[in-house]
Amino acid sequence: MALETFVNSEPFTFGVELEIQVVNTHNYDLTKAASDLMRLIQGETFPGNITPEITESMIELSTGICHSHEQAVSELHAIRDVLVKAADQLNVGLAGGGTHAFQQWSDRQIYDAPRFQYISELYGYLAKQFTVFGQHVHIGCPDPDSALFLLHSMSRFIPHFIALSASSPFVQNVDTGFHSARLNSVFAFPLSGRAPFVLTWDSFEEYFTKMVNTGVVNSMKDFYWDIRPKPGYGTIEVRVMDTPLSVDRAAAIACYIQTLARYLLTDRPLKLSEDDYLVYTFNRFEACRFGLEGTCVNPQTGERRTIAEDILDTLDRIAPHAAALGSRAALDEIGALAKARVNDASWLRTVFKQEKSLNETVRQQCLRWRE
């Protein structure tokens, strides 16, 4: 199969996708209700889209093409409200969070759609274990070479996105010690990790053709990279974030990525090199394990600092671009998180410490989702 033509899009526009937990309101375990939710929202009017995901206990919402923080917040609230209304009719709950705190993966049911059935047949039990919940952000790019430049420039900031969004400390009744345990599930897939270091679309097309000829992939959907190009949309897609506990947090993180993209493509402050990836996996692990307190190593200088410190320094550098995009409020929220060194994983642990019950913790997650 040939690679799609890259459709040039308006630079620095963005879209947000959120995978949401569907739980019962008895003990707040995951429940099979995605098909019923999809039936109930038919005929409803809302921006963006709502689609099923790989298991019946997940649903995905996505905005349209956004230009500003204000627009993203408005669209996310509108879509969220439609879903909450449908969930109330079914007496089920909806929650953010990168993992469900105590669900058993073997109980999951694959959603009845050809691609999901194919993934289940190909990956076996990993498909059911993939009942994890992420935020994806698309950034518009003016041309394919700019998309690849932005992809590799943005890779240095992957620890920021992981630490800020981290909301998956619990897995199957256990505190994993991680801030984002969700990404451990993603890493099990053979085509996960980082994209190959190529900087021209011609070279990327050659790589894609070679991969197709091996029989390993059929389309870009088969790559589970942390950031991947989406030629049909004219975007790059940042895929490392846990789904936050609120749509407002999701919008703030998306606008941080948007502002960073404008800085990286407009100012071009980085000289890209394969050596940028020498510490990529280490930095990624630190963000997953320790969140904002994790260590971030600069691949060029060897300088070590906390991820929180690196975020605060980055916010200073991109401030003029935040002003141009109207995203100062979003970046103020990001700065407050970095200064306090807290994220949604911190909040979940605090609730569990107080309540001594993961069932109650998930119930409170459902309340957060409505805020």
From Swiss-Prot:
<keyword id="KW-0067">ATP-binding</keyword>
<comment type="function">
    <text>ATP-dependent carboxylate-amine ligase which exhibits weak glutamate--cysteine ligase activity.</text>
</comment>
<comment type="similarity">
    <text>Belongs to the glutamate--cysteine ligase type 2 family. YbdK subfamily.</text>
</comment>
<keyword id="KW-0547">Nucleotide-binding</keyword>
<dbReference type="GO" id="GO:0004357">
    <property type="term" value="F:glutamate-cysteine ligase activity"/>
</dbReference>
<dbReference type="GO" id="GO:0042398">
    <property type="term" value="P:modified amino acid biosynthetic process"/>
</dbReference>
<dbReference type="InterPro" id="IPR050141">
    <property type="entry name" value="GCL_type2/YbdK_subfam"/>
</dbReference>
<dbReference type="InterPro" id="IPR014746">
    <property type="entry name" value="Gln_synth/guanido_kin_cat_dom"/>
</dbReference>
<dbReference type="InterPro" id="IPR011793">
    <property type="entry name" value="YbdK"/>
</dbReference>
<dbReference type="Pfam" id="PF04107">
    <property type="entry name" value="GCS2"/>
</dbReference>
<dbReference type="InterPro" id="IPR006336">
    <property type="entry name" value="GCS2"/>
</dbReference>
<dbReference type="GO" id="GO:0005524">
    <property type="term" value="F:ATP binding"/>
</dbReference>
<keyword id="KW-0436">Ligase</keyword>
<protein>
    <recommendedName>
        <fullName>Putative glutamate--cysteine ligase 2</fullName>
        <ecNumber>6.3.2.2</ecNumber>
    </recommendedName>
</protein>
